[in-house]
Amino acid sequence: MFSNIKNGWADFDFKGFKGVCSYIQDPVKDICQALINTFEDNSKEVVVEMDEEGSKWFLKITSNDVCMYREENPKEVKSSRENFIKEFTNDVCRDIELWSKWEPENDPKSVCDDIESMLYDIVFPELIEKCQDELKNWKEIQLKGLKGEEIFKCAYELTYKEELLAILESVDFDLGTYIWLFNKDLPLDYLYGIWLHCDASVTDILIDMILEEKRMELDD
């Protein structure tokens, strides 16, 4: 999404839409705030303006999608909100040290902390809502027409998926963990599938699984 981040300039490329971000804005914080605001109020539409020192382009963010367009060309390039957040958060986390120097007069450590806090405010509620929707949809599909032992098996799975969701809501993991889980199409189903093959409590396996995933990433 972002590249060549240096001296208050960065290139932007998403879904074939190309633009430039300049020192006139703080693109990461502006986009973060727009995503936070449109989650808190799903009727809201926020437009983030990017000034290339001459021409302008825009990100229009809603609770469902993100559109990119230019001042002189109103034709939009559209993405789902979820896909935009996945790429945006992964991208910013990867290059957070570069973004911390976007405005040289600011303390890089303080800027990193601010960015991480804003990314958390985006990803955590989005992840929890995604898991809640996943669980709701799963129940609506799985519980239809079940009888006898099938109901018991379904109730068993439901109990542990609900426990996994409760753990995600209450246990503090690092930002990278929340981003990693948000990138899964069905986070609860993914976690439940791993838990089924392990002899451990739901909490233990969730934590152990996350640590193992992190170790594999470091080895790569």
Feature names for model-found ranges:
Residues C32-I36, T89, C93, K161, ...:
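Generic solvent-exposed, charged/amphipathic alpha-helical segments
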Residues M1-I61, D65-K75, K139-I151:
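N-terminal low-complexity, intrinsically disordered segments
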Residues E40-D41, E97, F173:
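A generic secondary-structure boundary signal that marks alpha-helix termini
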Residues F2, S55-L59, I115-L127, C131-E134, ...:
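Aromatic-residue detector
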Residues S22, D26-K29, P74, K136-D220:
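Acidic interaction surfaces
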Residues G8, K56, L98-K101, N137, ...:
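Residues in intrinsically disordered, low-complexity segments of regulatory proteins
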Residues D13, F58-E140:
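Long protein-protein interaction modules used by eukaryotic assembly/scaffold proteins
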